Every structure is written in structure tokens, then in C-alpha cells.
Amino acid sequence: MRVKEIQRNYQHLWKWSLIILGMIMICKAIEKSWVTVYYGVPVWKDAETTLFCASDAKAYEKESHNVWATHACVPSDPSPQELVLGNVTENFNMWKNKMVEQMHEDIISLWDQSLKPCVKLTFLCVTLNCIDVKNSTNNNTEEATITNCSFKVPTELKDKTETVHTLFYKLDVVPLNVTNNSSISSTYRLINCNTSTITQACPKVSFEPIPIHYCAPAGFAILKCNDKKFNGTGPCKNVSTVQCTHGIRPVVSTQLLLNGSLSEEEVIIRSENITNNAKTIIVQLNETVKINCTRPGSDKKIRQSIRIGPGKVFYAKGGITGQAHCNITDGEWRNTLQQVAIALRRQFNNKSIIFNSSSGGDIEITTHTFNCGGEFFYCNTSELFTGIWNGTWDKNCTSTESNCTGNITLPCRIKQVVRTWQGVGQAMYAPPIEGTIRCSSNITGLLLTRDGGNGKCNSK
């Protein structure tokens, strides 16, 4: 989408031009010529303007998107209008889009405002004495990913401290000295303490996205490309104008795109430069794939409260839960991956398409990262991105085959200390959530990278 501004070459005639334009649109509505008048007089040009947001946010909700949108956005239009521009061709470039940049800035603002009143956890940047808690052969719990740590915290009396014990995920701590036997107590620190200020997310605050509409101010309109096979750059011959976009959920995830919009026809491949393997490939699916994720609860209390001085509480992990995981129907996923391979093969001159898991990097890149019910999941997707397509699929699946009616289970790990992707030097501590957590999403797209050789694609 692009924002266009009406060019004001004759400022003293502007009021009259609006009145005349309105009259022409009313009087000529049944004729075809009015489109030319609307689009050509006055002249439209590219413009950089600040859009405003609209939403159906509920003031009584404590969810962060609702809180932010209640103050930052206007109510959404119950009957939005769209005007098709006949015989109009416009150039679009989704990779250089001011509206997308503004959306990013708004999400940064949302997270910043959500964390401002919350407790800074500078006291956690101390030496942690930790020992593994794995003492059983039960693989259905998260014991192997947990360490039990003791450290000193401030009390109500400024000159006194006390020692407390709590559980941390191993992904959240870094050893200061490595020992050969992992069961022996060792010293650690929190993973982001050397680079970031850590803020604890306020209790009873969640991050479940709601649809946000972006709207053009008076004198501007948003141009929308309606070509069903548009690849993101170049001319678009099916153009319309809208005052506001459709509702966009600001979902933050990696590798798999969740709860987005679908292609109306075939799978669409988009890249700023498909021949440059450093550029991300965005795949828009034409059918959703359901992904169901669970973190089982526990009989024991999962969250414990630790006082860290006057009026401040640190919500620590106090119990072990079941192993977090996600399920995807095998047959649905294989059929989807086949359609993606066919679309990719058209881009790469019918070369064989080989799917592999991520080739390395930060955990946010090597796993499918997303928020599920307030916990941050990091799921291993190596079972998803595997297979070769060279005109035939080496892993054919239909719903009637016995080995494809089951689920692909993705083991997931959880982090509580999360780097806020929108800012440098900032990290968030997500307090543990009590009870069983479940979330169900629709996979509507993929993020892929291509290696430097053939048609080999890695998840990103």
C-alpha cells in the first residue's frame, strides 16, 4: 500500500477545488469519467505523512495492545469505503514502505509503554549459584531445561540482603565458570545482564494482538494494490483507494508467519532480490495450516513472589511444568510444503528445491519464536523443513496414508529473559504463568533464506 497526497499548486483555490470535486463526484457518479476527475484533478503524488490508527480496543481490557490502542487510536470505521481506480497503473514497492516503518515504531511504543511502570530487575545482575534439577528419567517435563539458583536480594532494610532460591531456564543464564560435571554447583549470570537493562513485565499484562487499522489523514488517501499475483514490487494494474487499511494484527514471530492474510489464488513468493541469498524470502500461503501449542501445568505452584525491597515484588519460577510443545498435522504440512516448493521452483528455473532447518545464528532465528499465552516459546522446527522437490516429492503425503494422519510434534523451550527486538540495550523478564497454557494459530506464511548455491532453502 502507498500513501498519496493531493498536490496543492494553487493554495487560494484549494477550498473551491474540494467543493467542485465533491460536486463532480456526486453528479457524475453514474458515468465512467468521474474516476479520471477524482484521480487526475488535483494531481496525486507520493507523500510521507503520519498515519493515524483505528481499532476496536476495549478500555476495560488489561491486555497491552488494548491499553495502548485505547489511548493512541480512534474507533474503527464500521462501514469502510473502497474506491476502485479504473485504467490506472501504479508502481508499488513493499520493501520501502513508510507505513510499515510506522507500524514498527508503534509496536516499539506499545512495548515501551507497557514496561515503563514495571519493576527494573537490576538486582538480578549478580552472581547466581546454580545446580541442575534433572534427577529423573521423565522426559515429559522441563526438568532438563531448568537450573536451581540461589542469590542475594535486597530487603526492606537497605543495608541488609537475604539469600533466595528460584528456578531459571538454562536459556536465560550463562555460566561464569564451566565445570566438567554439570550437577556440581557453578556460578552463572543472567544472559542479558552485560548488555541490557532488564525490566519485569507487569503482572496481569498480556500481549495478545488485536487488529489495528492504519488511516490516512484528510487530504491523503492510501493506494491499495489488488492484483492477486502481485510480487511486492513493480506496476500494479488493479488499484483502489481506501482511507484505512484492513485490521492488521502486530504478531511478532520468526520462521512461521501466524494469523496473517492468505493469497487468494496460488502460493506467492516475495523477495526484495530473489537472486541475492542474503535477502529474506517471504512466502504467502493460500491455505492455512493449524498449529496447536501447549505448556502443561503442574500440581505445584509455578510462580512464587519474592520481595525485593519496599513495594517491589519479583515473580520467580517456583515449580516445574510439563514439556512445552506444538503439534501440526503431518499431511497438511507436507502438502503445503509441496506447494511452496512448486512456487520456489518457478523462481529458480526448475532447479531441485531442498528444505533444511536453520543453518545457525541466534536462538530467535534458529527456532520458531512467538508468544503463547504470556510465555515466550522457542520451538525446534527441524522436523518441518526437510525434503527434496525436483518435480516429484520425496515425502508424498495424503490424508489417507497411515503415516501422514498423525501430528508432527515440535519440542519447545521457554525463555523468561527476552531481548526486546525493537531496541538495543533492553530486555524483558516475562513472569511465569500459572496453570496450563494453550494457544492455537494459523500458519499463513513462511520466512526462508536461500544458501549461496542451488535452490536450497533454510527456515529463518
From Swiss-Prot:
Region listing for V4, in residue ranges: 379-412
Region span, V1: 130-148
Membrane-spanning ranges: none
Sugar attachment sites: 87, 135, 139, 148, 177, 180-181, 194, 231, 238, 259, 273, 286, 292, 327, 350, 356, 380, 390, 396, 403, 407, 442
Residues in coiled coil: none
GO cellular component: membrane; viral envelope; virion membrane
Region (V2): 149-193
Annotated region described as V3, given as residue ranges: 293-325
Positions of region (CD4-binding loop): 358-368
Disulfide pairings: C53-C73, C118-C202, C125-C193, C130-C149, C215-C244, C225-C236, C293-C326, C372-C439, C379-C412, C397-C404
Secretion signal span: 1-31
Annotated localization: Virion membrane
Keyword terms: AIDS, Clathrin-mediated endocytosis of virus by host, Disulfide bond, Fusion of virus membrane with host endosomal membrane, Fusion of virus membrane with host membrane, Glycoprotein, Host-virus interaction, Membrane, Signal, Viral attachment to host cell, Viral penetration into host cytoplasm, Virion, Virus endocytosis by host, Virus entry into host cell
Location (main, coarse): virion
UniProt cross-references to InterPro entries, sorted A to Z: Gp120_core_sf, HIV1_Gp120
GO biological process, one term: clathrin-dependent endocytosis of virus by host cell
Pfam family, one: GP120
Note from the entry: Though this sequence contains a complete Env coding region, insertion of an extra nucleotide creates a stop codon prior to the normal termination; the authors suggest that this variation can account for the lack of infectivity of this clone.
Entry protein name: Truncated surface protein
Organism: Human immunodeficiency virus type 1 group M subtype U (isolate Z3) (HIV-1)
